[in-house]
């Protein structure tokens, strides 16, 4: 019998990668996406172009223009289908934007996740539920790490336990400044774990680093690499916010993250949580990214520097993915930072 997957945020970066990946594995896909990214970040961030491509390419993809906060609409979909897999990626993804409309941010990220979890529990309890969380659940605690300033990046002191592999899941999510986005995602993160641990359901929470890939509709407030490449390609001014442009992020390609989902789906666990980023394998500072993209595109970046950093922004963040690799030893990265940048620049989605 054909397997069935429900994917929220199905036209977004991780959602659309999930649609492609699982459609090509033979799943029937029910996608939920109401292009709220356009509301958050403006016309340039709309995902409608991506949704159109998916509908044209995959006959086993059915799209629903539904708001995840609307329990009646979500319940109707769950009553119509028995799902084997649920991938919940729909979100308000920017910590800057969250401060403008806290109610919208919280209802989308926390309430919307609760709507999904409760319908999963009631109607498809045998399914595997995967949630895309964020490293922002750790708040600004990573900024307390002992950092060294190098020429183009900040780096962790070599004698620190996190130096070799990055930050693991044991870092506290308490007593820190999260941003309102980090707080709403923390609520959803813990809820997803709780539905696994309390109700005994198969849930996996993936705390993403910087998620990226050629399908990213980059905007100033979200999608750092895609937006930076876009600015350099079209000659638009890019703004660096604080830390001298030396802040470091680990970047994971959308394919590598969705491949994590695939491995988890095949051998699911209950109430599990994983850090999911590029780790030591794939990380970069803003200054390093500018230099690399300039070389790929053969164009000089036009950028300005603002001394004030974004509230709660990480100076250095690299995810330790050792726990996932231990649980799923057959999984590994297929993309490094140079592959990611080359693909974004060659996608032409500017």
What are these regions (language model features)?
Residues 51-59, 153-172, 228-242, 267, ...:
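A short C-terminal helix-loop "cap" of Rossmann-like NAD(P)-dependent dehydrogenase/epimerase domains
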Residues 73, 115-118, 251, 256-259, ...:
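Conserved mid-core alpha-helix of short-chain dehydrogenase/reductase
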Residues 243, 273-274, 287-290, 298-316:
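C-terminal "lid/loop" region of Rossmann-like NAD(P)-dependent oxidoreductases
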Residues 1-209:
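N-terminal Rossmann-like NAD(P)+-binding domain of SDR-like oxidoreductases, especially those catalyzing
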Residues 186, 199-202, 212-227, 236, ...:
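Glycine/proline-rich active-site loop of Rossmann-fold NAD(P)-dependent oxidoreductases
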Residues 254, 273, 309-332:
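Conserved C-terminal active-site "lid" loop/helix of NAD(P)H-dependent oxidoreductases
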């Amino acid at each position: 019998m054909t397997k069935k997957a429900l994917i929220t945020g199905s036209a977004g970066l991780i959602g659309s990668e999930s649609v492609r990946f699982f459609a090509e594995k033979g799943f029937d896909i029910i996608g939920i996406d109401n292009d709220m990214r356009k509301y958050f970040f403006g016309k340039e961030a709309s995902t409608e172009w991506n949704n159109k491509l998916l509908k044209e390419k995959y006959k086993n993809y059915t799209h629903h223009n539904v708001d995840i906060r609307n329990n009646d609409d979500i319940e109707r979909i769950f009553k119509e289908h028995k799902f084997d897999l649920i991938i919940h990626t729909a979100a308000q993804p920017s910590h800057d934007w969250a401060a403008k409309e806290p109610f919208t941010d919280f209802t989308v990220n926390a309430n919307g996740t609760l709507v999904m979890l409760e319908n999963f529990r009631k109607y498809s309890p045998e399914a595997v539920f995967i949630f895309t969380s964020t490293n922002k659940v750790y708040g600004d605690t990573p900024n307390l790490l002992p950092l060294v300033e190098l020429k183009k990046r900040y780096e962790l002191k070599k004698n620190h336990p996190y130096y070799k592999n990055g930050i693991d899941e044991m870092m506290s999510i308490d007593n820190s400044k999260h941003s309102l986005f980090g707080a709403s995602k923390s609520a959803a993160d813990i809820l997803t774990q709780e539905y696994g641990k309390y109700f005994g359901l198969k849930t996996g929470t993936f705390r993403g680093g910087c998620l990226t890939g050629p399908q990213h509709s980059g905007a100033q407030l979200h999608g750092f690499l895609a937006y930076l490449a876009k600015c350099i390609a079209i000659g638009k001014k890019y703004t660096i916010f604080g830390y001298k442009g030396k802040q470091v992020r680990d970047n994971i390609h959308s394919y590598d993250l969705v491949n994590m989902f695939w491995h988890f789906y095949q051998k699911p666990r209950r109430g599990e949580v994983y850090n999911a980023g590029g780790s030591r394998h794939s990380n970069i500072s803003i200054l390093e990214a500018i230099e690399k993209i300039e070389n790929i595109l053969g164009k000089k970046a036009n950028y300005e520097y603002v001394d004030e950093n974004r509230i709660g922004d990480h100076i250095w963040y690299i995810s330790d993915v050792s726990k996932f690799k231990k649980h799923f030893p057959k999984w590994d990265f297929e993309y490094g930072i140079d592959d990611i940048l080359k693909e974004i620049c060659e996608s032409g989605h500017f």
